[in-house]
Amino acid sequence: MLTASPGHGNVAGRACLRTAAARVAERFFERPTVSTFSHAVAASDERLAHLRAEVALFMRDHVLSLVSHDLRSPLNAIHSWAYVLERKLDAADASAQRALAGIRSGVEQQVKLLEDAVDKTRAETKSLPLARESFPIGAPVERAVADARLAIAEARGTSIEVQSSSDAQRCDGDRERLAQAIWTMLVFATEASAPRATITLASSLENACWRVEVGYTASFAAFSDAELPHAMEPFARSQAMQPREAGRIAWALALPHRVAAAHGGTFEQSATVDGERSSLVLRVPLTAQ
């Protein structure tokens, strides 16, 4: 719970939020220790490290966004009720007026803390510029599948089946960002699946949009098994298994969500139920919006 006291409390709260954000960014992904990757070429290692860093950055921003939203709602309610109490209490009651002033001051300090420690941090990466170009949609899919196999799928014995009949269709968008988004979806699906499972990737056209759906059978045991190779940190895997409010996604999927939105598209995650089929769906317009 955030402290509302002036001075030390405010500084401590700010430091706590920044430390939490840093841990999200630094600890989200751990490099696999499976011997399968011990002799990977330097270029592949560098690319995978870059992909993990990108996912960690987007996840940090997503968590900060949730913190900002979820804390502001009760703070606004407290502030509103303070005014209601002010009209009900005796203006001559010095103790009551001091209490109300303390409530308002505490709320204002917490809002300032959110602005300084959360909103300013998010502002650095809030906008997502796109390097648009025309490309065949099969290209980022091929790249993402190859990178996902190197990152974790081969170590898990996971098969990735690609279904596509429109690889030559061209899309106007950020090819690299979309490849990162698909890679994140594939890695998440692999993490969420039992070893030696098969996950599917279907690339298709739908109402002037490019649609990518990754399907898998969720296994909570695989998510939590420390003996299995993992690309995600334990806290990220644990959060992914928690119930979600309608419209919200697992933190680990913040990158595809942001990339889809930047292209004027959508990203959806179905309910994650142990032992049942789940899906991740990304849609982006074929032409710039």
Language model region names:
Residues E86-A94:
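Short acidic helix/loop segment immediately C-terminal to the autophosphorylated histidine
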Residues S105-Q110:
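Short alpha-helical segment of the dimerization/phosphotransfer core of two-component systems
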Residues A131-A146, A179:
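A conserved beta-strand-to-alpha-helix junction within the catalytic ATP-binding
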Residues A131-P136, S159-Q169, E176:
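Conserved catalytic submotifs in the C-terminal HATPase_c
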Residues A222-R237:
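Short conserved segment of the HATPase_c
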Residues G264-T272:
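Glycine-rich ATP-binding loops of the HATPase_c
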